[in-house]
Amino acid sequence: ECTRYMTGVSHTDPEVGTPFALKVMQRLNDACQEWKEKENIDFSLYGTPLESTTYKFAKCLQKRFGIIKGVTDRNYITNSYHVHVTEEINAFDKLKFESQFQKLSPGGAISYVEVPNMQNNIEAVLSVMKYIYDNIMYAELNTKSDYCQVCGYDGEIKIVEEEGSGKLVWECPNCGNRDQDKMSVARRTCGYIGTQFWNQGRTQEIKERVLHL
């Protein structure tokens, strides 16, 4: 969002966006080094995937700056330097792109690849894992593992917009069950797989994720 606001393009744009984003990351690292020398306390840059911050910061930015297309027009902001969840990119290109930002995140970093159910395509999983091992510091595969306790549906439970309120809710595509107490939904956020459901900002982000395989 920062890069898009400052340059008008995504940080995946090789001519303008990426060089600008890398300069921002380097400046943040330089600031950490300056603070370290001044305070004799270690500072480091961390590529955070904070759960509530993505929603909280989005609402604060909307309140302060209004709605800016491609910047503050969603109820979430992108985690650290990740490729935006709606941007079409394959798994290998995404990992290669984000690896250059991980090198500038000495305090910690993580990248994700969104995949469908891969239980019948282990060869593809191993291919991505090998690429991760050879090319990036830390990355994980996100898949869907849901279960409806009403009808026994075993597949991806969808996010839909509730009639009238516009609220995002989880719905079994087989029987229409929307009772969160009667379904098991697992999604990776903040580096771990959670099953406790999420705020509206994070739910919108999950809904808009595109697959990378």
Predicted regions and their residues:
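Long, C-terminal-biased catalytic regions of enzyme "large/alpha" subunits
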Residues: E1-L213
